[in-house]
């Protein structure tokens, strides 16, 4: 098996690199068709003022939050600035994590803060978006999906009648 691209000691196979590039291209093409309700540079732009507006305009009461490339870069730890943001968000809205990945340390971080975590979610399939709504005891139209992928997060939220926020990605200084 060919191995290329060594980032922080993680080797990727040629197949993984090709799949990543195809996913990036797919997301780019879909971003021309599927539009989020909100675009932000990073999650911290979703601040108290924006949350207040979302509550008033759309009746938002809960957030489905993605992990990788939304609140942390690659497979690194969640930066402290985003940990603080999550704590403040939790004070204003119901929060649940829905991610296609799974990381025991990240899951433990959220569970320790009484935030439900759904890993291996198979986004954009409807099942776990709806499961998240059930756990928050909210109808889909009262939920905001926050993520970095147009197909997985934005399309997944839209097809479930949810509001969506596209995060450009985690800033380098957030690492």
State where each predicted segment sits.
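Substrate-recognition element of Asp-dependent hydrolases with the DxDx(T/V) motif
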Residues: 62-110, 122
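Conserved Lys-Pro-Asp/Glu-containing loop-to-beta segment of HAD-superfamily phosphomonoesterases
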Residues: 125-151
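Short, acidic/turn-prone active-site loops that include or flank metal/cofactor-
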Residues: 120-126, 168-173
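Non-catalytic pre-domain segments flanking phosphatase-related domains
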Residues: 1-65
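Acidic, Mg2+-coordinating phosphoryl-transfer loop and its flanking beta/alpha structural elements
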Residues: 146, 151-175
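Short, structured coil segments at secondary-structure junctions
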Residues: 91, 112-114, 160-162
């Amino acid at each position: 098996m060919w191995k290329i691209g060594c980032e922080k000691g993680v080797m990727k196979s040629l197949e993984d690199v090709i799949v990543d590039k195809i996913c990036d291209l797919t997301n780019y093409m879909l971003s021309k068709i599927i539009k989020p309700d909100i675009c932000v540079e990073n999650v911290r732009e979703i601040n108290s003022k924006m949350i207040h507006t979302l509550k008033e305009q759309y009746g938002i009461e809960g957030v489905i939050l993605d992990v990788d490339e939304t609140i942390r870069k690659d497979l690194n730890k969640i930066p402290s600035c985003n940990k603080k943001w999550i704590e403040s968000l939790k004070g204003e809205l119901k929060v649940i994590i829905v991610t296609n990945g799974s990381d025991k340390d990240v899951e433990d971080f959220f569970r320790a803060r009484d935030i439900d975590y759904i890993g291996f979610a198979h986004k954009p399939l409807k099942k776990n978006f709806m499961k998240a709504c059930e756990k928050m005891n909210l109808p889909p139209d009262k939920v905001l999906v926050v993520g970095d992928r147009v197909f997985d997060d934005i399309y997944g939220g839209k097809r479930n009648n949810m509001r969506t926020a596209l995060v450009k990605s985690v800033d380098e200084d957030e690492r």
